[in-house]
Amino acid sequence: MEVLVNLMPHELVLEIEGRRYIVDHVEGAAVRVSYDLEEIFKIGNKIPVYREVPDSAVVKGLPDPEPGRYFVTSAMVARAAQRPDVFSPNTHPKYVKRTRRTGPIESVCGLISYI
């Protein structure tokens, strides 16, 4: 059996072929990513602009892989994890449902892999 585990701090609402699926978040789950930054320049000699140092990301709190178990996290965590079992919600404007054109996202129609 395949299981989708929501590690985000809120529920995930998927709308697939006209049906809604609500995936509750795991209580107490705290998956985080940290990375090093380096200043690349200043705007107007005052406002610093940083970039993420390549390959410096460290993911904490992500469970180890298990066959048939898939994890949904934030895009930042999924991108840093670089694992085939870790995804983020597909929030591309073409693939979300909203009550208003610029309103909050009600549901997504799929997930995104970053590998």
Question: How would you label these PLM feature ranges?
Answer:
Residues 1-3, 7-115:
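Intrinsically disordered, low-complexity segments enriched in small/polar residues
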